[in-house]
């Protein structure tokens, strides 16, 4: 497993329990390969496991285009887990170009009753510029409604501050 973090899943689970949290999730880019480890850790620390993946989004998964961006997908229900597995598998089958990529067709096949979607980090839709990012965000929001969230993060960098200001204006 290649991680974007300096702490282990065990560290996260233990700390979440210490802080009185009720939910644990961990996401990987393009798949959910560590779900078993995290589900067992959630059980060990008496936390509810949330199935999540940081997917790669592109405008058309069938085009050989490497300008992908990140988007977070989280299951709310057991059906949502199955649906996420399906779209992640389909991204590998019909959208693989360097990475398993999904497009609007796959994303909008997800039922808002069963999944949450967020804009992810600064490597999210903001990579396409403000005008295109706003169009995509509005389309996501229309479909997912209350199951769609803008992800404001605190990283003390100029780029993160710009993204946060853009999100707050929306």
Regions found by a protein language model. Give the residues of each.
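Phosphodiester-processing cores and adjacent nucleic acid-binding clamps
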Residues: 1-170
């Amino acid at each position: 497993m290649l991680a974007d973090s300096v702490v282990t899943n065990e560290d996260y689970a233990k700390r979440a329990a210490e802080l009185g949290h009720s939910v644990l999730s961990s996401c990987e880019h393009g798949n959910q390969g560590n779900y078993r480890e995290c589900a067992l850790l959630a059980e060990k620390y008496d936390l509810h496991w949330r199935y999540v993946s940081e997917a790669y989004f592109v405008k058309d998964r069938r085009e050989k285009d490497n300008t992908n961006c990140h988007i977070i997908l989280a299951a709310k229900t057991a059906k949502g887990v199955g649906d996420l597995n399906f779209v992640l598998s389909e991204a590998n089958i019909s959208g693989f170009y360097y990475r398993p990529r999904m497009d609007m067709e796959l994303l909008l096949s997800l039922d808002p009753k069963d999944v949450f979607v967020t804009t992810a980090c600064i490597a999210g839709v903001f990579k396409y510029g403000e005008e295109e990012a706003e169009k995509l965000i509005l389309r996501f929001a229309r479909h997912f409604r209350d199951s769609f969230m803008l992800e404001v993060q605190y990283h003390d960098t100029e780029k993160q501050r710009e993204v946060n200001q853009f999100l707050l204006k929306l």
